C-alpha cells in the first residue's frame, strides 16, 4: 500500500470517492471482476441484481414476468440509491442501471466508475446459453444485444472514470489494470 506522510493514500482516495462501481453490458464480467476487485481492495462486494433479488425474494426473470421492465427498474433505482450511500463497496450494476439519470448521478457522486467494455460478439458468446436474462428471450438475441449497446454505450462512456476492455482478457488481468489506475488516481488526489 502506498503511503503519503504516514497516511494511506487509498484512505485519501476513498474520502473523495467512497466506492468503485462497475458498469457495462451483460456478459462483460462485472460480477466476476467485482468479486476479485473487492478482495484486492478489501472492500465489500455487492451485485445490484442479486441485491434486488434478495429484497424481493424472487429472481430477475420472475420480476420481469410479473412487474415488467418498469417494475424492475423501480426496484433497481431504490437499490442503487441505497448502495451509493455506503462506503468501501465494489458495486456491480445491471447492464441497464445507468439508463436512469438518477442512477447516473447517485453512482457518479459516490463512486469511481469503471466501464467494462466488451464487443457485442463477445457478449453473445458469454450470454447465449444463459436463460436467466429476460432481455435476451428473443428469436434473435444478437440483434437485441446490438440494439442495447447502441443505446447504452454512449451513457457508459459519458459517466466512466475508466474504460477498460474485457475482450480476450482474464479477470485477474482486468483487476490488475483497474487497481493500477486507482493507484495512479490516488497519487493525483494527494498531489492536489
Curated annotation (Swiss-Prot):
GO terms for biological process: amino acid biosynthetic process; aromatic amino acid family biosynthetic process; chorismate biosynthetic process. It comes from the Bacteria. Its cofactor is Mg(2+). GO terms for molecular function: ATP binding; magnesium ion binding; shikimate kinase activity. Substrate binds at residues 49, 73, 95, 152. Mg(2+) binds at residue 31. Pathway: Metabolic intermediate biosynthesis; chorismate biosynthesis; chorismate from D-erythrose 4-phosphate and phosphoenolpyruvate: step 5/7. It is found in: Cytoplasm. Binds 1 Mg(2+) ion per subunit. It catalyses: shikimate + ATP = 3-phosphoshikimate + ADP + H(+). Keywords: Amino-acid biosynthesis, Aromatic amino acid biosynthesis, ATP-binding, Cytoplasm, Kinase, Magnesium, Metal-binding, Nucleotide-binding, Transferase. Its EC number is 2.7.1.71. The keyword Secreted does not apply. One of its GO terms (cellular component) is cytosol. InterPro entries: P-loop_NTPase (IPR027417), Shikimate/glucono_kinase (IPR031322), Shikimate_kinase/TSH1 (IPR000623), Shikimate_kinase_CS (IPR023000). Belongs to the shikimate kinase family. NCBIfam families: PRK05057.1 (NF003456). HAMAP family: Shikimate_kinase. PANTHER family: SHIKIMATE KINASE (PTHR21087), SHIKIMATE KINASE 1, CHLOROPLASTIC (PTHR21087:SF16). Monomer. This is Shikimate kinase. It comes from Hahella chejuensis (strain KCTC 2396).
Amino acid at each position: 500500500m502506498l503511503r503519503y506522510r504516514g497516511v494511506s493514500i487509498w484512505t485519501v482516495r476513498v474520502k473523495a470517492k467512497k466506492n468503485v462501481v462497475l458498469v457495462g453490458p451483460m456478459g462483460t464480467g462485472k460480477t466476476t471482476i467485482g468479486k476479485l476487485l473487492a478482495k484486492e481492495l478489501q472492500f465489500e462486494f455487492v451485485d445490484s441484481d442479486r441485491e434486488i433479488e434478495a429484497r424481493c425474494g424472487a429472481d430477475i426473470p420472475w420480476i420481469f414476468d410479473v412487474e415488467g421492465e418498469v417494475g424492475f427498474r423501480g426496484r433497481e433505482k431504490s437499490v442503487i440509491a441505497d448502495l451509493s450511500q455506503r462506503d468501501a463497496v465494489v458495486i456491480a450494476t445491471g447492464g441497464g442501471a445507468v439508463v436512469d439519470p438518477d442512477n447516473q448521478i447517485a453512482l457518479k457522486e459516490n463512486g469511481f466508475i469503471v466501464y467494462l467494455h466488451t464487443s457485442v460478439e463477445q457478449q453473445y458468446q458469454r450470454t447465449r446459453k444463459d436463460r436467466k436474462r429476460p432481455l435476451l428471450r428473443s428469436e434473435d438475441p444478437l440483434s437485441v444485444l446490438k440494439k442495447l449497446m447502441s443505446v447504452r454505450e454512449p451513457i457508459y462512456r459519458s459517466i466512466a472514470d475508466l474504460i477498460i476492455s474485457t475482450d480476450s482478457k482474464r479477470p485477474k488481468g482486468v483487476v490488475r489494470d483497474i487497481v493500477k489506475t486507482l493507484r495512479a488516481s490516488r497519487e493525483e488526489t494527494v498531489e492536489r
